[in-house]
Design a protein with these regions (language model features):
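C-terminal/domain-edge helix-coil "capping" segments
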Residues: 21-38, 105-107, 130, 140-203
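N-terminal segment of the mature soluble domain
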Residues: 37-39, 44, 49-116, 146, ...
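Short, surface-exposed coil-to-beta transition loops
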Residues: 131-135
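Bacterial N-terminal signal peptides
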Residues: 9-20
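Generic short beta-strand segments
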Residues: 116-121, 154
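Bacterial N-terminal signal peptides that target proteins for export
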Residues: 1-11
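Extracytoplasmic/secreted cell-surface and envelope-processing proteins
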Residues: 122-126
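Short glycine/proline-enriched turns and hinge-like loops at secondary-structure junctions
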Residues: 53-55, 127-130
């Protein structure tokens, strides 16, 4: 190889190594992990806010955070919408406790997450407007619709504000992600043994 070509090849290899070191690539999930986890479907959120896009935006955030936690498989929102259309269910209010098993069976899910958007927008403070997000969530057992877990949280952009405005969140998307992580921090699926014991106690 000519000296000039050898130098050029070395530069290209070094450049590739530097790019690889600088880029952050999340590690792939362990082989077989996802297929062994229970499936959870997030139903369309009831939207009590004034923003028509709140449901879609928050659903994407919650599905993403749940996926990162690797405690369950999340059913894609598009699949949920398809089942709702096939069953002629207009919104989550149409999923009564009696219909939970049917919906879950169509989604091949062991658990359903239902919830309500209480707030999605901004509130006026002495220092100006800040984003505000509030959500309730309930985990429903696919067999009978019982509530196995629930949580509620309302936060604003200045909840963690410190001196000189440090820590204030001004982005609604950023605040939504913070809410989802906070709300799901203690999210755990009941173990099969606990679920079976509870079901037996209801007979």
């Amino acid at each position: 190889m000519r000296p000039r070509a050898r130098v050029l090849a070395s530069v290209l290899v070094l450049g590739g190594l530097l790019v690889g070191c600088g880029a952050h690539v999340p590690p792939p999930p362990p082989v077989g992990l996802a297929s062994g986890l229970p499936r959870v479907a997030l139903l369309p959120l009831e939207n009590l806010s004034t923003r028509n896009d709140a449901g879609d935006r928050l659903s994407r955030v919650f599905v993403g955070v749940l996926g990162e936690a690797r405690v369950c498989q999340t059913v894609q929102p598009g699949d949920v919408d398809q089942v709702f259309m096939e069953l002629r269910i207009r919104d989550a209010n149409g999923v009564t406790r009696e219909r939970v098993p049917e919906v879950a069976r169509r989604l091949d899910a062991q658990w359903l997450l239902a919830g309500t958007i209480l707030e999605y927008g901004s509130v006026r403070t002495a220092d100006g407007e800040v984003p505000s997000v509030g959500v309730t969530l309930r985990l429903l057992d696919a067999r009978d619709g019982r509530t196995a877990w629930s949580a509620m949280r309302v936060i604003t952009g200045d909840d963690h504000e410190g001196l000189f405005g440090m820590g204030r969140v001004r982005s609604l998307d950023q605040l939504s992600e913070r809410l989802a992580r906070t709300l799901l921090a203690d999210f755990r699926l009941p173990s099969p043994r606990d679920s079976t014991s509870t079901a037996g106690a209801r007979r």
